[in-house]
């Protein structure tokens, strides 16, 4: 009996001394879940103030668009349209933070440029991010078609916020979403990680074998002064049971 108590005491002592498991990663975003739709409403006066500072000239009505303008036959049609003022821009989202330098109180406006006659192949136009410190425009960058703000985060703790953004493209019933994490330090866009495809959903195509694929992106646990590392797990679900996700790969998702 004494032997049993002795063994139990030793076991309890070992367990007590064993270090608890440490959390070594955090979820950056789970794309199996729909990102919340932006509830931000931009007043008309703010739209005018921001757009006037970002664009030298622009249109306020699609009916005023022209197909024949200077540079309309150039290889870069969208750039020519912007230069000619042939666009009907609008602010689609906004977020506050410290984006270009630490310790700032700034507002970032996401702008759908909507160049005149931009086609489906052009993703219906470019997207820009305009960052203001008070009334001053401090950054105006193209987002490379990233048209939604998914999350704001300061991953390395340097006081500068990064933005996780995504884009979506639908073709023949196949939905593809891409995502990037970018910093706007010093007023320039720096892509910290291009995650590639994070959603591939073919359910709307209603073809044999159609399914839904989505990524969960993790970042290493916060450590001051260290750059974060990322891991990606990819899940698949049938169109009939969209909530029953199964892990099928790790790393970047292979395009269908």
Language model segments and positions:
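Sec-dependent signal peptide recognition
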Residues: 1-7
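Hydrophobic h-region of N-terminal signal peptides that target proteins for export
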Residues: 8-17
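Acidic, small-residue rich beta-repeat scaffolds with periodic aromatic anchors
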Residues: 16-76, 80, 171-256
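A short beta-strand motif characteristic of beta-propeller blades
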Residues: 79-87, 137-142, 202
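Short consensus segments that form the blades of beta-propeller domains
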Residues: 84-86, 115-123, 141, 169-174, ...
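A glycine-rich, hydrophobic loop/mini-helix early in the fold
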Residues: 95, 104-150
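Acidic/hydrophobic-patterned starts of short beta strands in beta-sheet-rich repeat architectures
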Residues: 98-112, 154-169, 217-231
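Repeated scaffold domains used in trafficking and secretory/extracellular systems
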Residues: 146-153, 202-205
């Amino acid at each position: 009996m004494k032997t049993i108590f002795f063994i139990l005491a030793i076991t309890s002592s070992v367990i007590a001394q064993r270090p608890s498991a440490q959390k070594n990663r955090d979820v950056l975003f789970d794309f199996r879940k729909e990102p919340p739709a932006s509830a931000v409403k931009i007043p008309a006066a703010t739209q005018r103030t921001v757009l006037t500072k970002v664009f030298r000239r622009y249109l306020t009505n699609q009916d005023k668009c022209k197909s024949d303008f200077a540079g309309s036959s150039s290889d870069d049609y969208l750039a020519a349209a912007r230069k000619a003022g042939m666009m009907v821009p609008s602010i689609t989202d906004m977020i506050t933070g410290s984006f270009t330098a630490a310790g700032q109180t700034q507002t970032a406006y996401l702008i759908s440029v909507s160049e005149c006659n931009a086609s489906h192949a052009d993703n219906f136009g470019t997207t820009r991010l305009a960052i203001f410190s008070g009334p001053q425009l401090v950054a105006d960058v193209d987002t490379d078609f990233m048209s939604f703000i998914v999350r704001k985060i300061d991953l390395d703790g340097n006081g500068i916020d990064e933005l996780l953004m995504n884009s979506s493209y639908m073709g023949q019933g196949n939905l593809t979403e891409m995502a990037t994490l970018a910093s706007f330090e010093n007023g320039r866009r720096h892509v910290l990680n291009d995650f590639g495809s994070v959603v591939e959903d073919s359910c709307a195509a209603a073809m044999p074998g159609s399914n839904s694929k989505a990524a969960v992106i993790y970042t290493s646990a916060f450590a001051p002064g260290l750059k974060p590392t990322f891991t990606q797990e990819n899940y698949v679900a049938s169109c009939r049971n969209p909530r029953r996700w199964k892990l099928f790969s790790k790393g970047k998702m292979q395009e269908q």
